[in-house]
Amino acid sequence: MSIAMRLKVMSFLQYFIWGSWLVTLGSYMINTLHFTGANVGMVYSSKGIAAIIMPGIMGIIADKWLRAERAYMLCHLVCAGVLFYAASVTDPDMMFWVMLVNAMAFMPTIALSNSVSYSCLAQAGLDPVTAFPPIRVFGTVGFIVAMWAVSLLHLELSSLQLYIASGASLLLSAYALTLPKIPVAEKKATTSLASKLGLDAFVLFKNPRMAIFFLFAMMLGAVLQITNVFGNPFLHDFARNPEFADSFVVKYPSILLSVSQMAEVGFILTIPFFLKRFGIKTVMLMSMVAWTLRFGFFAYGDPSTTGFILLLLSMIVYGCAFDFFNISGSVFVEQEVDSSIRASAQGLFMTMVNGVGAWVGSILSGMAVDYFSVDGVKDWQTIWLVFAGYALFLAVIFFFGFKYNHDPEKIKHRAVTH
């Protein structure tokens, strides 16, 4: 098997694990374990906490003491055990701590999988710029396949989804032992601990434009987590209406939600055109408007013919909402930051989005869901309209508050990756 194919298998399993539970665990906790919205939000906030502290720490370990593929193997071995135990947990506080341990082991594997891929491709004499994107696409495929499997097997409200994720983690841990050895980087005496942790990038907050950018990254990061947490429970709640109880939306909500991931792949291909033609500010603004539409379509969507079209449109615009912000934001950081702290700045960007933003978004969205619930019945239309209003508010403030002059030549030859 070629190294490219071996890495595709790794990428497939990496995101298959996540897809097994990320969008359905909320439904399991709400409908089966009867957790509150705040409980569910707290459990999902573990992802944000782990994203803040773990990638930098694990990066130091992989750089200094442990080969990357071995660190990757150990992380997934921990995930396998923790996810197996999580399937038996029924207390919300315990679920938070268990999923926090899982997140602290899993979140570093995203960066480690990229590092392993780049190193293996370099060892094989392949150009990562052209060879890596097809490998990463297999990750999206793995995520979608897992969602479909859990949905078709009717496991969305069952703890078995966690057993599936545990088994896949164990398989990937064993598979990692077969990967080529990744040499430990030689120590550089001039590299400080703060630099390794990405803390030197905090100097960017002295620049007003960069400070505003990172602030918006955090606030929009809060939006990214909302549909992962509550999109699936929202669709399951249509079962309360006898008219929709046997509908496709209620029976297979994850299959419908997987259209969002499919849309991601399509919108990725359009990013170079939009960046060059309209500039980063406009592309990021389009993302915020797309988030407004995402939530707005959810507010008025249902399993009826017209309502289903709105739900489908919500899934499609998700691709724009997610990709246009994450990737254009990364390109902006690449352009604006000095090369000496560029890697740290990219890490700070991801920490603000997937760490602080995701943590805040998980907790506040859970509180909002509870606030607009009466006797366990959620007013989903109001909930989604509140989230849509928040995204629209961000778009308006961003339009007037973020200054950026578009120069097509700056991004003419810049590669865009996801």
Swiss-Prot record:
Residues exposed to the Cytoplasmic side: 1-9, 63-70, 113-136, 181-209, 276-277, 328-348, 403-418
Organism: Escherichia coli (strain K12)
PANTHER family: BLL5896 PROTEIN (PTHR23522), XANTHOSINE PERMEASE (PTHR23522:SF9)
Protein family per UniProt: Belongs to the major facilitator superfamily. Nucleoside:H(+) symporter (NHS) (TC 2.A.1.10) family.
Residue spans crossing the bilayer: 10-30, 42-62, 71-91, 92-112, 137-157, 160-180, 210-230, 255-275, 278-298, 307-327, 349-369, 382-402
Gene: xapB
Entries under NCBIfam families matching the protein: 2A0110
Reaction(s) catalysed by this chain's protein: xanthosine(in) + H(+)(in) = xanthosine(out) + H(+)(out)
Record keywords, A-Z: Cell inner membrane, Cell membrane, Membrane, Symport, Transmembrane, Transmembrane helix, Transport
Function field: Uptake of xanthosine. Can also transport other nucleosides such as inosine, adenosine, cytidine, uridine and thymidine. Transport is driven by a proton motive force.
Phenotypic consequence of gene deletion: Mutant grows very slowly on xanthosine.
Activity control mechanisms: Transport is abolished by the proton uncoupler 2,4-dinitrophenol.
Locations listed in the record: Cell inner membrane
Cross-referenced Pfam families: Nuc_H_symport (PF03825)
Name the record gives this protein: Xanthosine permease
Keyword Zinc-finger appears in the UniProt entry: no
Membrane topology, Periplasmic segments: 31-41, 158-159, 231-254, 299-306, 370-381
GO MF term set: cytidine transmembrane transporter activity; nucleoside transmembrane transporter activity; symporter activity; uridine transmembrane transporter activity; xanthosine transmembrane transporter activity
Record-level GO cellular component terms: membrane; plasma membrane
Coiled coil region boundaries: none
Keyword Membrane attached: yes
One of the GO BP terms on file: nucleoside transport
Membrane topology: Multi-pass membrane protein
